[in-house]
Amino acid sequence: MSHYDIIHKPVISEKAYAGMERGVYSFWVSPNATKTDIKSAIQKAFDVTVVGISTMNVRGKRKRVGRFIGQRADRKKAIVRLAEGQTIAALEGQA
């Protein structure tokens, strides 16, 4: 699996932006990816050193369209902590 297949996109929220100041970044990742896969993909894609990873499975919300009820897909979120002093330049401009 390529690192492009593992990392879907960064999480965009106030909590995620607050973590960027401390070197903690959040990403939506493939539900099948392991912590080892995520670590190697982040290091390869952004050329940084990953110190720790926390992952969580986020259940999809139930949504209604008229009288029909559907459900969004379940997703996996990875919270990645980088080595001291390192940042991901591509995401710093968004904060």
Swiss-Prot record:
Top-rank taxon, per record: Bacteria
Name the GO cellular-component terms: ribonucleoprotein complex; ribosome
A single Gene Ontology molecular function, please?
structural constituent of ribosome
Q: Which InterPro entries match?
A: Nucleotide-bd_a/b_plait_sf, Ribosomal_uL23-like, Ribosomal_uL23/eL15/eS24_sf, Ribosomal_uL23_CS
Q: Which UniProt keywords apply?
A: Ribonucleoprotein, Ribosomal protein, RNA-binding, rRNA-binding
Q: Which GO terms describe its biological process?
A: translation
| Membrane-crossing residue ranges in chain numbering | none
Q: How does it assemble?
A: Part of the 50S ribosomal subunit. Contacts protein L29, and trigger factor when it is bound to the ribosome.
- Give the matching NCBIfam families: PRK05738.2-4, PRK05738.3-2
What is the protein's known function?
A: One of the early assembly proteins it binds 23S rRNA. One of the proteins that surrounds the polypeptide exit tunnel on the outside of the ribosome. Forms the main docking site for trigger factor binding to the ribosome.
Tell me its family.
Answer: Belongs to the universal ribosomal protein uL23 family.
PANTHER family assigned: 60S RIBOSOMAL PROTEIN L23A
The protein's name is Large ribosomal subunit protein uL23
Natural source organism: Deinococcus deserti (strain DSM 17065 / CIP 109153 / LMG 22923 / VCD115)
